[in-house]
């Protein structure tokens, strides 16, 4: 009986030191592996989140500009800007004496309906100041059009009254006499003319955002009304946009095909310029955007060379993530 008990006690002495060390080593390896997997997953999440933010910014900025461009030269009931009375003429920026929106971006900025798409090449050429300055490697894109939905006449707002063949700019709360009386088509019920708000937007890049100081941003000068007076507001559109570039596809022989691409502000489509080509039409718009993240990324070095449009931005050699996108947009109203 005593021998059995002594034998049992000798076999209940616990783990040896070697066994304990092996167990601790295995546990340590498992913990280290779990931490590495966590860190890698966290790093992948941060990278994916950064990529998604840059892509979202690029998509939003492109969609905003594209929406305007696709509706350029829409004047309500027709798409012929040269048929709108009150538009800027060669030598007469404001023939009917309409109120020039303040702060003025130029005498023809709001009224040059003969050029529904315009701009400047790698320079800020508007008379109104750029909020926070303007980036030197970026174009200015100006789009003129009318609102899609008809509205009621509004005192102080620049509007267009139009039919299928003519139009007129006005700013009173009364429809111009040339379009009275407004009658409805007996079959379709459509009024003989419609009132639409004049819309003018000039997109540009500022080197610093008001929302996120130090970050470049896409901004626009937009025509609106305040206290019964037409004014120009400066709005921030998308922080993170470093450059916008525009080229216009023009048709010079009236065959509804693009013959060549020119930079914004080119004289070939400016009726007041010596190199103007009579009958030229802008058929397409090609847009480039360079978008960057709003914060730096650890371990990232951007060594790519960016060449949007006709500008070479070179290598940035910093820790911001960037994306360059481009799109060619058909201008539907140029064909009608």
Where are these regions (language model features)?
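A generic, residue-level signal for flexible/boundary positions that often mark functional hotspots
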Residues: 45-48, 231, 323
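Flexible, small/polar- and glycine-enriched "cap/hinge" segments at structural transition points
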Residues: 331-332
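N-terminal pilin/flagellin-like segments and related low-complexity appendage regions
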Residues: 61-284, 288, 294-321, 336
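Aliphatic-rich helix starts adjacent to a transmembrane/signal segment
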Residues: 2-8, 13-18, 22-74
């Amino acid at each position: 009986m005593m021998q059995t008990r002594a034998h049992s006690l000798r076999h209940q002495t616990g783990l040896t030191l070697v066994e304990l060390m092996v167990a601790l080593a295995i546990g340590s390896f498992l913990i280290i592996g779990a931490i590495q997997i966590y860190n890698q997953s966290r790093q992948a999440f941060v990278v994916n989140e950064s990529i998604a933010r840059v892509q979202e910014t690029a998509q939003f900025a492109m969609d905003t500009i594209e929406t305007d461009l696709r509706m350029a030269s829409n004047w309500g009931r027709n798409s012929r800007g040269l048929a709108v009375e009150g538009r800027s003429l060669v030598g007469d920026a404001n023939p009917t004496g309409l109120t020039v929106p303040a702060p003025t971006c130029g005498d023809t900025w709001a009224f040059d309906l003969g050029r529904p798409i315009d701009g400047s090449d790698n320079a800020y050429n508007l008379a109104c100041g750029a909020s926070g300055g303007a980036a030197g490697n970026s174009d200015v894109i100006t789009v003129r059009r009318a609102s899609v939905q008809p509205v009621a006449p509004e005192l102080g707002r620049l509007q267009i009254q139009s039919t299928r063949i003519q139009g007129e700019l006005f700013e009173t709360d009364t429809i111009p006499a040339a379009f009275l009386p407004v009658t409805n088509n007996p079959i379709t019920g459509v009024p003989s003319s419609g009132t639409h708000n004049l819309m003018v937007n000039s997109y540009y890049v500022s080197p610093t955002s008001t929302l996120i100081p130090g970050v470049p941003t896409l901004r626009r000068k937009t025509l609106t009304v305040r206290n019964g007076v037409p004014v120009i507001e400066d709005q921030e559109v998308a922080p993170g946009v470093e450059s916008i570039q525009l080229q216009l596809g023009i048709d010079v022989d009236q065959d509804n095909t693009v013959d060549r691409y020119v930079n914004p502000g080119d004289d070939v489509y400016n009726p007041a310029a010596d190199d103007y080509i009579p009958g030229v039409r802008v058929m397409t718009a090609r847009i480039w955007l360079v978008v960057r993240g709003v914060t730096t990324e650890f371990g990232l070095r951007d060594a790519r060379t960016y060449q949007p449009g006709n500008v070479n931005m070179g290598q940035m050699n910093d820790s911001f993530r960037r994306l360059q996108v481009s799109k060619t947009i058909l201008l539907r109203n140029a064909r009608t």
